[in-house]
Amino acid sequence: MNPFKWLIILPVRFYQLFISPILGPRCRFYPTCSHYTIEAVQQHGVFCGLWLAIKRIAKCHPGNPGGVDPVPSCGCHSDKETTPKEKSDNA
């Protein structure tokens, strides 16, 4: 794994193992913000993953009802490829 990813993931794992059990469940979302952060960094890399995590943590407050909020899929590997026919139709 990329060493820069570990710089993000290790503090989150520390939080999950040692701090979260003391504080108790507080996250309003599933997966929790800490799990979301790890998954986002693993899927999208350090910069995009960290940005997604920051946006998610900013939404986790008493004014937001929470709910299921999975990590979005990466937009760089689109399933829909543009065919030559579509290109000529758009021209």
Swiss-Prot record:
What function does the entry list? Could be involved in insertion of integral membrane proteins into the membrane.
Principal location listed in the UniProt entry: membrane
Question: Topology relative to the membrane, per the entry?
Answer: Peripheral membrane protein
List locations, semicolon-separated.
Cell inner membrane
Taxonomy, top ranks, is: Bacteria, Pseudomonadati, Pseudomonadota, Gammaproteobacteria, Thiotrichales
Q: Which is a Pfam family this sequence falls into?
A: YidD
Q: Which UniProt keywords apply?
A: Cell inner membrane, Cell membrane, Membrane
Annotated region Disordered: where? 66-91
Q: Which family does it belong to?
A: Belongs to the UPF0161 family.
Which SMART domains does this chain map to? Haemolytic
A cellular component term from Gene Ontology for this protein is: plasma membrane
Native organism: Hydrogenovibrio crunogenus (strain DSM 25203 / XCL-2)
* Keyword Membrane listed: yes
- From start to end residue, where is composition biased (Basic and acidic residues)? 77-91
> What is this protein's name?
Putative membrane protein insertion efficiency factor
List, alphabetically, the HAMAP family matched: UPF0161_YidD
